[in-house]
Design a protein with these regions (language model features):
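Flexible, glycine/charged-enriched surface loops at secondary-structure junctions
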Residues: 52-54, 216-226, 317-321, 325, ...
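Glycine-rich beta-alpha junction loops
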Residues: 60-63, 151, 168-169, 226-234, ...
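Metabolite-binding pocket within alpha/beta catalytic cores that recognizes anionic/polar moieties
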Residues: 2-195
Length: 339
């Protein structure tokens, strides 16, 4: 019994020491605000004065890197992410992974474009995924415009349609992977920020006005909708059952990005506007059953063809982005020009 008591005492002593060391380690780590400030200092040493405080940040999602063409070629400054302190290198095909500073539209508004983003499924922490957003805040950005490629859950959506987001489901956050988890940094915002109006209404109104102007000048069958984005961790595309669940929960599109950035941007007081490009239609039908008589007699190739209908793939995502590039560029240019 004495030996057991001694062992228990040692265990509690070790647990207390481990907890104390963990707290001490956390206190020694530089805060996100400190790290973002160091990154901004590094960038401003290289930037001309008129680009040092961009008003708008634009995040280019999968297949949408062509948005960088909206930045005036004269005076443009750009760096690969790996050359910027604190920025992770993107490992996703279709994400160039670079920061681009310049001016845009006839108003010559200073902007910064993030061509590609870090994803949670790449193994990055939420802190790393959202670090670029915090850098934007320290730079002085007032408005963030985010784009992504997403799967369409709403049956009214077609591949190539654009969805202006008005709300989201943070599935990863609901199970503990939240970008604001941990000690709150008052330099950015309050401990419990409300998100009931995360997607700025006046910016969404501007988006619709801009879309109508674009359609008048460039007629197209492409439609713009307004809807709810479901954020999932990835990297697998959703199962049929998961798609039905998300649809029943009220989601119109589903993807693996954007929401952590939105949350951190709103926590920091920036206005946000976000668009999803529908790059595939999610499969909501149930998986064919093994005893389905209509499947009897089909060859292995015929069965594979039936099961592959509507299955998402990254190449499809990139191709849809290319096809929608002109409309997305025209929309973004009109919005930025009126900010």
């Amino acid at each position: 019994m004495e030996l057991l008591n001694h062992a228990a005492h040692l265990y509690h002593s070790f647990s207390h020491l481990s907890h104390s060391l963990s707290e001490a380690h956390d206190e020694m780590l530089p805060t996100a605000f400190h790290r973002a400030t160091e990154t901004v200092t590094h960038l401003r040493r290289k930037l001309p004065q008129h680009l040092a405080t961009p008003r708008v940040a634009i995040v280019c999602g999968s297949g949408l890197g062509g948005l960088v063409d909206l930045v005036d070629a004269e005076g443009r400054e750009e760096w690969k992410y790996e050359d910027v302190p604190g920025f992770p290198k993107s490992t996703v095909v279709g994400h160039a992974g670079k920061l681009v500073f310049g001016t845009m539209s006839e108003t010559k508004i200073p902007v910064v474009l993030l061509v590609g983003r870090a994803h949670f499924y790449e193994g990055h922490s939420m802190d790393t995924v959202t670090f670029a957003t915090r850098v934007c805040k320290v730079l002085g950005v007032e408005t963030m415009l985010l784009t992504n490629a997403a799967g369409g859950l709403n049956s009214a959506y077609e591949v190539g349609d654009i969805v202006c987001l008005n709300d989201h489901l943070n599935l990863a956050g609901l199970v503990g992977f939240h970008p604001l988890r941990g000690q709150n940094e008052e330099d950015f915002g309050v401990r419990f920020p409300p998100l009931s109006d995360a997607y700025d209404l006046s910016l969404r109104q501007l988006a619709y006005t801009s879309w109508q102007q674009l359609r008048t000048q460039q007629p197209s069958n492409r439609k713009m909708h307004e809807g709810v984005y479901a954020f999932v961790a990835g990297p697998t595309y959703e199962t049929r059952a998961e798609c039905r669940m998300l649809s029943n929960l009220g989601a119109d599109v589903v993807g693996m990005s954007t929401v952590p950035e939105i949350i951190v941007a709103r926590h920091s007081g920036m206005r946000v506007l976000a668009f999803s490009l529908v790059t595939n239609k999610a499969v909501l039908d149930s998986v064919p059953k093994g005893d389905d008589p209509s499947l009897q007699g089909l060859s292995r190739e015929q069965l594979a063809e039936r099961l592959s209908r509507g299955v998402a793939n990254h190449e499809e995502v990139l191709e849809a982005g290319k096809q929608a590039a002109i409309d997305m560029q025209g929309l973004v240019l009109r919005i930025v020009g009126q900010l």
